[in-house]
Amino acid sequence: MKTIEITVPGSKSLTNRAIILASLSNGTSKISNISNSQDSQIMIKAMKKIGVQIKKTGNKLLIKGNGGVFRKIDGNIDVGDAGTVARFLTAIISLIPGKITLIKSKRMKERPMKELIKALKTIRTGIILIRGDISSQFISSIMMIAPILDKGLVINITGRRISNSYIDMTIDLMKKFGVKVEKNKQNKFIIKKQSIIPTNYVVESDLSGASYFFAAGAISGKTIKVKNINFRSKQGDLIFPDLLKKMGCHIKKNIKKGWIKVKGPKILKRINVNMSEMPDTAQTLAIVAAFAKGKTTIAGLSTLKMKETDRLKALKNELNKMKIKCEITDDSIKIEGGTPQKATIETYGDHRMAMAFTVAKLRIPGLKIKNPEVVKKSFPSFWKKFNYICE
């Protein structure tokens, strides 16, 4: 059987971070292989509105940074339901003279922001205290503005830290923009006042997006190769194929050429796993688990309740429709694998619900996905890519 080769677009998470850092730098940066996701388009529009010069050509951006010096601005900025934009922009506008109001979707208004706002109120003192168990985006947003603060910043994180991989991703990208981040103990970061150096940066492939094609290989009998993988990536989702290997999949990696190949076994095995470092691929693994033999437990999912929808409840509802038994707690889901049946899947306005359940169509041709257009939030070309592997 032939190998189906796929590439995925640039990471939305890294694109949005690169836009912020380039905007705060002291010169012109070129960002290539950007995500053309809806969220990244919202980020570009928002940064332009606060005075940053950005020129977009295809999947490239030319950004003229202002060194963190903004003119007075009054007005509204629509961030829709883009979580990274809302959190990252809140940190930046706390430094801008004037009154700026972020217009958010109904769901975005329900997602946590208070802890970030509380921390930003003391940011000019040079020392802040922030909880680490709500959203890693709070910490990333504060880290990225720290170099332009007069006193720099000491960030003290209380409680356990969730989604550490996203914080590591932020630190790694800051280094690429010439920023030094000191780590003092597990929950303390020191970022001195310093210049953010403009750079030419190529955005890595989106490994959350790649997970759907890895999962497709796991359940379909097809051999699928995802190309342009950066094996030095800080994206937590890099280890997703390793989880599939534990479930019995055949995995091949070529670090030099940058690809990962996945082919599923005749019978998938259950798995017990903590996915706190890669929560965006939990729904993908849940679909694979639905076809596995035995009960799979996926833990470390406390943040899923606060995403585009309550993803744990949404998973339970839709898996039940497919005649798959599952149980949920505040931070986990247990799935009894079996023979999923065709159903009409509600996506709850959540791009990851749509893409994860679409994978099941490879085994259940009659499965229907409601509001399939929601994928544009992170992966506008998803359907084109998926239809290619169905040929």
Region locations from a protein language model:
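Structural preference for solvent-exposed beta-strand-turn elements
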Residues: 1-391
